[in-house]
A protein has these predicted regions:
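Structural recognition of an alpha-helix C-terminal capping motif at a helix-to-coil junction
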Residues: 36-43, 56-68
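Arg/Lys-rich amphipathic alpha helix in sigma70-family domain 2
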Residues: 51, 67-85, 104
Length: 170
């Protein structure tokens, strides 16, 4: 494959999976660093794109690159003491007039907060499940068996329900 084809592939993937990049950035980076991680994920994809060999689905390859890059990024921030609590981007915005929209946004924020308390591996499984990947696809992305995906996913769901239940009671 020539460089022009590789560039076209990268641009297509970057556009098609933009929502995935943002979800992963939001899940693995503090609020003030979402943009930085998003850019790092795109750079990782740029470097990895020539390695794609169509033995797996493109989405499997893309998720694997993105999740591994995000976990490495998160570990490097923790290792070097750069992990901090940033101001929530939403707190500076004017309140919305739509109560239903506000409630939905609050629920999404609660879900992301609960997901952030999980281990990196559990966050990855939850994200892939929420993105409606099949157990087989999740197994391919993470390099584990389908049955283990089921076991881990059940544990993750229980933990999330416990954490979300505690938040709703407070």
């Amino acid at each position: 494959m020539n460089s022009q084809e590789q560039n076209a592939r990268f641009v297509e993937w970057a556009r098609s999976y933009d929502a995935v990049w943002w979800k992963i950035a939001r899940l693995y980076a503090p609020a003030g660093e979402h943009e930085a991680l998003h850019q790092d994920l795109l750079i990782a994809l740029w470097h990895a794109a020539p390695l794609y060999r169509a033995q797996a689905k493109a989405s499997t390859f893309i998720y694997r690159v993105a999740l591994n890059s995000a976990m490495n990024w998160s570990r490097s921030r923790t290792r070097y003491g750069r992990r901090h609590v940033a101001l929530d981007e939403k707190s500076a915005q004017a309140p919305s007039k739509d109560n239903e929209s506000d409630e939905r946004e609050r629920q999404v924020e609660q879900l992301y907060a609960a997901l952030a308390t999980l281990s990196e591996a559990d966050r990855s499984i939850a994200l892939l499940y929420l993105d409606e990947l099949s157990y087989r696809e999740i197994a391919d992305v993470l390099g584990i068996t389908e049955s283990y995906v089921g076991v881990r996913l059940n544990r993750v769901k229980k933990r999330l329900m416990e954490r979300l239940g505690k938040e709703n009671r407070q």
